[in-house]
Design a protein with these regions (language model features):
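Catalytic histidine-centered segment of alpha/beta-hydrolase-like enzymes
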Residues: 285-294, 298
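C-terminal motif of bacterial Sec signal peptides marking the signal peptidase cleavage site
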Residues: 16-18
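Conserved HGGG/HGGXW glycine-rich cap/lid loop of the alpha/beta-hydrolase fold
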Residues: 47, 52-96
Length: 312
């Protein structure tokens, strides 16, 4: 098994497809933006899952975390959709997706089924699945449940579940925020403006606020109530007894300034993989690594996918 551990900007030099010009400027030669489509899939329990789709080619599914929405991928999508079919979900409870009541409706098997419903709605048998934060937890679990439907797996920030318990044990104070989210009524402390406080992009911030106003704060907290381990207990929905090896190429990207999920959680990730495994640790990036280091993250993802795309 090939094991590649990359630090800082070591992947920045990976070649991307060059834009050929014949005298005109790069801006003139640039392709027009690919149109975005608002679409819906119906999950196994009847919940409607909204997603934004664009492009054609191998399917890439993007899954956001908390607090976020499908717009999280606004910088990545145009880097991919000239050669890939890119779909970005609003996970259940968020923005334009269904918002069922009750903790049980946010258990991991239902979140995994939502992703499967989107892939099915696209008429595909396989996809690359990419997730950040809760989206990464969903992506790991999608791999465990549907390895045969994966082309590749891309994870931002969240350790493999086998290592997650170790991180909780070694740095319990870093998960205090999650314990607070699990408390009854915690959603009453949330506002759309507060949830969007981390967003630095002036153009995107109003879009985040509007998306959060359309979302269910109770649903956001139910992700933690249904799936995050309580107290000092080991992970439950995140931790099946025996993890299957990740039998597809795996890319893991982590911002080393992340204070909720520490970089040490990714140690030994390669032991959980049966195919080539690439880890990119970015010293300057925080938890929202796809925003903090967008150029490096997006360029890496494109180059990594291109290198693993079957020859025509």
């Amino acid at each position: 098994m090939m094991r590649a551990i990359l630090f800082g900007v070591s992947l920045a030099a990976l070649p991307l497809a060059a834009c050929e010009t014949t005298g005109e400027s790069t801006a003139t030669a640039a392709k027009a933006p690919v149109a975005l489509e608002d679409k819906y899939a119906t999950s196994a329990d009847g919940v409607k899952i909204h997603y934004v789709a664009s492009g054609s080619g191998p399917l890439v599914v993007l899954i956001h975390g908390f607090p976020d929405f499908s717009g999280s991928w606004s910088k990545l999508t145009p880097k991919l959709n000239d050669a890939y079919r890119v779909v970005a979900l609003d996970t259940r409870g968020y923005n334009l997706s269904g918002q069922p009541e009750g903790v049980a409706n946010y258990a991991m098997p239902k979140l995994v089924a939502d992703v499967d419903a989107v892939i099915t709605a696209e008429g595909r048998q396989k996809a690359t699945v990419l997730g950040h934060d809760w989206g990464a937890a969903i992506a790991w679990n999608y791999a465990f449940a549907h390895m045969d439907k994966l082309d590749n797996l891309i994870i931002l920030s969240v350790p493999h579940p086998a290592n997650f318990g170790r991180q909780l044990t070694n740095s319990p104070q870093n998960s205090d925020y999650a314990r607070n989210f699990q408390k009854e009524g915690s959603e009453k402390n949330l506002t759309a403006e507060g949830l969007a406080g981390w967003v630095q992009d002036a153009e995107m911030k109003p879009k985040y606020i509007e998306a959060f106003k359309r979302s269910s704060f109770a649903a956001m907290m139910n992700y933690y109530r249904a799936n995050y381990p309580a107290g000092n207990n080991p992970p439950t929905a995140l931790a099946p007894a025996n993890f299957p090896k990740i039998a597809v190429p795996l890319l893991v990207i982590h911002g080393m300034k992340d204070t909720a999920l520490l970089s040490m959680g990714h140690n030994d990730t390669w032991d959980q993989a049966a195919k080539d495994t690439t880890l990119l640790m970015i010293p300057t990036a925080n938890h929202f690594v796809q925003q903090d280091a967008a150029d490096l993250v997006n360029g890496t993802i494109r180059s990594w996918l291109d290198a693993r795309r079957p020859a025509k």
